[in-house]
Amino acid sequence: PLGEGDFTHLIPRLEADARAAGQPLRISGLTPEGAAAVRRAHPEFGICRNRDYEDYVYRADDLRNLTGRRYQPKRNHINRFEAASDSRYEELTPALAPECMRLEREWRAGHDSHAAELTAEQRAMQRAFDHFGELELRGGALFVGEKLVAFTIGSAINDEAFCIHVEKADTRYDGAFTMINRLFAQHLPPHYTLIDREEDLGLEGLRQSKLSYHPLFLQPKLTAQRLTEEQLQLRALWLACFPEDTQDDVEQFLLSRYDERRCLVARRDGRIAAM
């Protein structure tokens, strides 16, 4: 979230809304500063981090120029693409939506994924095209001859950072992904010095691809969740017995790995005394 205002006073209202929906409250996408604010105001909340959802943030000039030995493999991809294809780059407009959706369907046909996730992505892409101007989106399209072979869509985070939301390419054209990545970065206004290419969702191939562009940093996105009474007692016991462990580590375990069905506890006077 943008801004520096205190949002923690809204948590009781958020919890009431979650209860009405029959769900526990989880506050996702928190920055480290936001998570710390939640913990200070509501110590009964735990914080966990998920590497799969951390955003990859790059220097825009690195993606524009691909200079240095570490980017030699990327330049090789581009050289092969340019040698084999008569291509051109255009700014993406909603008029290209049918071609983009066609390419997305072709891309999807060659990838194993959950049908529900893919359907959600298709709906999101179609809504993006339907409201392209209202959402202040911009994108790029790569053609070989008259055929669209790659496209990308994104939006500004602020005056310095731009976020890539969608990038698709026809993998039959070696280097198309690398080409659209660089061309779009080159056509962004120079005041964008950072490019956020979002998360890898824990997909190994996607992770290796994003790492191969050498991110400047990975932006943590933390989740806050109210701990159950048992989890609160376990946290207190754990930290008392193992003071060298951090609260972050304990809460990470309790929220991401702990399963009360597999945890044996001993109680004294109604409280957990051993686990």
Task: Name each model-derived stretch.
Residues G5-L92, I195:
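Acyl-donor-binding surface of acyltransferase catalytic domains
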Residues A21, A84-S85, L135, H191, ...:
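Structured helix-beta-strand junction loops
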Residues T67-A124, L227-Q252, Y258, C263-R267, ...:
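Short amphipathic alpha-helix that is part of the acyltransferase structural core
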Residues L137-A224:
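Aromatic (often tryptophan-rich) hydrophobic motifs at membrane interfaces
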Residues E104-C163:
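A mid-sequence, solvent-exposed acidic-amphipathic segment
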Residues C48-Y56, L216-L227:
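Conserved catalytic-core motifs of GNAT/GCN5-like acyltransferases
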Residues P1-G34, F143-T171, E251-M275:
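Conserved donor-binding loop and adjoining core beta-sheet/short helix segment
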